[in-house]
Regions:
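Charge-rich, low-complexity linker and terminal segments
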Residues: 2-29, 110-196
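Basic (Lys/Arg-enriched) interaction patch that binds polyanionic ligands
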Residues: 85, 93-94, 186-191
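Short, intrinsically disordered, mixed-charge
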Residues: 53, 89-96, 142, 194
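A positional/architectural concept
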Residues: 6-90
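Residues that recognize and position ribonucleotide moieties
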Residues: 41, 96-97, 133
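Helix-adjacent hinge/juxtasegments
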Residues: 87-116
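Surface loops and adjacent helix of pleckstrin homology
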Residues: 79, 100, 145
Length: 196
């Protein structure tokens, strides 16, 4: 029984910390006048820690949320730019990766909450605020390329032991061909392909 109480306390404490971490991202749209509004946020590694996301070593980003409030709908435009420090997928060397992205969201009001469509959000009538932290988080994460490659690999300025070893083991490398004899059975199979 005591373990359950401690577990419940820890879960409650974590939930309270998350709510506190995301509180600055609440936009209370009820008190705003009809028209354009802008909200700016500085995003660092603590933002990603609140989401329990550990893909970035560090982050220095700016997020801008533009709200165009109309009588029946809210038009949001999210823009993110800055740098995240990540590990290269090839060499595991750290580097700063430039991030830029934008996303538009239309918020409408209805009987119940519905976020089935990625660009339309329906909030229940009577809602007075909206938290934009999840949208900023997803925009940043989805703006990162699938393969994170150190820029020094492309321009040849990166000196890395891993990169040297990969180059040495490259089968297209002539040095590799000299060091490794080809089994004569494979040569016979190659001849079958070229005899046609």
């Amino acid at each position: 029984m005591r373990r359950r109480t401690i577990f419940f306390y820890i879960c409650t404490l974590n939930a309270q910390l998350m709510v506190k971490a995301f509180k600055p991202y609440d936009i209370q749209f009820v008190g705003l006048k009809i028209g354009h509004h802008e909200f700016a946020y500085d995003i660092d590694s603590t933002f990603f820690e609140a989401f329990d996301y550990a893909e970035f070593n560090d982050a220095a980003l700016k997020a801008h949320v533009f709200l165009d409030k109309k009588t029946t709908i809210l038009d949001f435009k999210f823009e993110v730019s800055g740098l995240v420090n990540v590990n290269c997928d090839v060499t595991n060397e750290t580097f700063d990766l430039s991030v830029q992205g934008q996303f538009e969201l239309v918020v409408n009001f209805g009987e119940e909450f519905n976020d089935d469509n990625e660009s339309i959000l329906i909030l229940p009538h009577g809602s007075f605020e909206m938290n934009v932290a999840q949208y900023i988080f997803e925009l940043i994460v989805l703006s990162i390329p699938a393969k994170r490659e150190h820029p020094g690999i492309k321009d040849g300025t990166l000196n890395s032991d891993i990169l040297s070893k990969l180059e040495e083991l490259n089968p297209n490398n002539s040095r590799y061909d000299q060091d490794h004899e080809v089994d004569p059975r494979w040569e016979g199979l190659k001849n079958l392909l070229t005899d046609n």
